[in-house]
A protein has these predicted regions:
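Short, polar/charged alpha-helical segment
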Residues: 1-2, 121
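Structural motif
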Residues: 2-23, 134-149
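Beta-alpha junction/loop-to-helix N-cap segments that form part of ligand/metal-binding clefts
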Residues: 6-66, 161-166
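Structural detector of well-ordered beta-strand residues that form the stable sheet scaffold
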Residues: 50-52, 76, 131
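Pocket-lining segment of extracytoplasmic ligand-binding domains
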Residues: 104, 110-166
């Protein structure tokens, strides 16, 4: 039997789903996105229940695994890590006159950290100005995006964080 559910980014629902899975004695848990994977990891610590994660941008930085080569514990999965330098090069290839790039992300999302830092490093090394705007809700993200347009950015870079993706 396969049991599945979707918390729709609601932390309370996520907790209930994980508790239900544990009460049902599932043989394996699969978590999609960093917050779910982290909570599943914590809830299965000290048990034999393995956790497989996906759509986690920085599993090492999030503390899910010790390394990508040897994850450790009873946990493994896949990463959707962004090759930020390639994305920046693509932006420049599409618009060689790019002078200013907007960074749009949720500052509270662990999945944003590595990609945003890599983007800043690339732009610093290549003399590209950047403007950061953040939002923690859909409404704030819309306002931040509008602000980037008003700031006159030539392009916008968004990492794979859950708030921006919704």
């Amino acid at each position: 039997d396969i049991s599945y559910d979707n918390c729709n980014a609601d932390a309370n629902v996520m907790e209930q789903i994980i508790s239900d899975f544990q009460a049902d004695g599932v043989d394996l848990m699969v978590g999609v996105a960093t917050p779910v994977a982290m909570r599943m990891q914590a809830s299965t610590e000290g048990t034999d229940t393995p956790v497989v994660f996906s759509a986690v941008s920085d599993p090492v930085g999030a503390g899910l695994v010790e390394s990508l080569e040897a994850p450790g514990a009873n946990l493994t999965g896949t990463s959707d890590y962004l090759d930020t330098a390639s994305i920046m090069k693509l932006i420049e290839a599409v618009n060689p006159d790019t002078k200013k790039i907007g960074l749009l992300y949720d500052i509270g999302q662990d999945s944003s950290t590595a990609a945003i830092e890599a983007a800043k490093a690339y732009m610093d090394e290549n003399g590209i100005e950047y403007v950061e705007r953040t939002g923690t809700t859909t409404d704030e993200v819309q306002l931040a995006a509008d602000a980037l347009v008003a700031d006159g950015v030539d392009a916008v870079f968004t990492p794979t964080d859950n708030t921006i993706m919704t």
